[in-house]
UniProtKB/Swiss-Prot annotation:
It comes from Petrotoga mobilis (strain DSM 10674 / SJ95). This is Ribosomal RNA small subunit methyltransferase H. It catalyses: cytidine(1402) in 16S rRNA + S-adenosyl-L-methionine = N(4)-methylcytidine(1402) in 16S rRNA + S-adenosyl-L-homocysteine + H(+). The lineage of its organism: Bacteria, Thermotogati, Thermotogota, Thermotogae, Petrotogales. It is found in: Cytoplasm. The keyword Secreted does not apply.
Length: 286
């Protein structure tokens, strides 16, 4: 969806843009390739490992890029610290990066056997192993039900997790989830049976939903009139927060009445993009 992001978000080719989820720097590089040499991009990410990759990737564009290790929930402090009052656009690309899924010992993937971590910020204290081994069955059921959107089997999965403690690796967790499901669900073709529980734990570890809404509320102070905000979500919980936040704020106007979805060609090249939704709004002013 890079082309769609650029065409909707870039209104000033000499402007200042903020990538709140810099990752490996792909969107930043695309933005700078679409703008003039006076443009600047501020890239923020809580994961220092991916920022190191971004720094190397963008070294030839270093005059136009500032990379900051921070959570996007601190975007107001980041921009004030840089002396930036107004920007021309914000971008958020939510979810787990390919590097995080494939990286060693990050614990995001149920296809590998790794320590059960799932922290986007490896310096934060609470990891997935702590949650799995210390939360009550009811609290586990709640987060699997709410954050994993696992409506039918949250109770049986949480019961199995508690029964099979201690659980310290991704494959130990996968085994516990398997034991809490009927065989028909374990062999379901379209989605791995551990997907929803892993999503729930990742959201809980990183406080993702709380941080999204908190961050969106901070954009307004820094947006020029007619500036744009583009947000890519990957599941309905994220999308609902984004849609409702802007829908209920009269100072924003949707430029995408319905979310933009990936093309079949994009899904073919990047299967993870199949669930992506892009929403873009314009700031109308206070």
């Amino acid at each position: 969806m890079v082309e769609e992001v650029l065409s909707y978000m870039i209104t000033n080719k000499d402007g200042i843009y903020v990538d709140c989820t810099a990752g490996e720097g792909g969107h930043i590089k695309a933005i700078l390739g679409y703008t003039n040499n006076k443009a600047k991009v501020i890239g923020v990410d809580v994961d220092y490992e991916v920022l190191e990759i971004a720094e190397e990737r963008l070294k030839d564009l270093s005059d136009n890029v500032v990379l900051i290790k921070s959570s996007y929930k601190n975007i107001d402090m980041v921009l004030r610290g840089l002396g930036i009052d107004k920007v021309d656009g914000f971008l958020m690309d939510l979810g787990v990066s390919t590097f995080q899924l494939k990286g060693e010992n990050r614990g995001f993937s149920f296809t590998k056997d790794e320590p059960l971590d799932m922290r986007m910020d490896v310096q934060s204290e609470k990891d997935a192993a702590y949650i799995v081994n210390n939360y009550s069955q009811e609290d586990l059921r709640r987060i699997i039900f709410e954050y994993g959107e696992e409506k039918r089997f949250a109770h049986s999965i949480s019961k199995s997790i508690v029964k099979n403690r201690p659980i310290n690796t991704t494959q130990e967790l996968v085994d516990a989830i398997r034991k809490g499901l009927p065989a028909s669900q374990v062999h379901e073709r379209h989605r791995h049976f551990a997907t929803k529980t892993f999503q729930a734990l990742r959201i809980e570890v990183n406080e993702e939903l709380k941080n999204i809404e908190e961050t969106l509320s901070k954009f307004e102070s820094f947006l020029k009139v007619k500036a744009r905000v583009a947000v890519i979500t990957f599941h309905s919980l994220e999308d609902r927060i984004v849609k409702n936040f802007f829908k209920n704020n009269e100072r924003y106007n949707f430029l995408t009445p319905k979310p933009i979805l990936p093309t079949q060609e994009e899904i073919k090249h990047n299967p993870r993009s199949r669930s992506a939704k892009l929403r873009v709004v314009e700031y109308l002013g206070a």
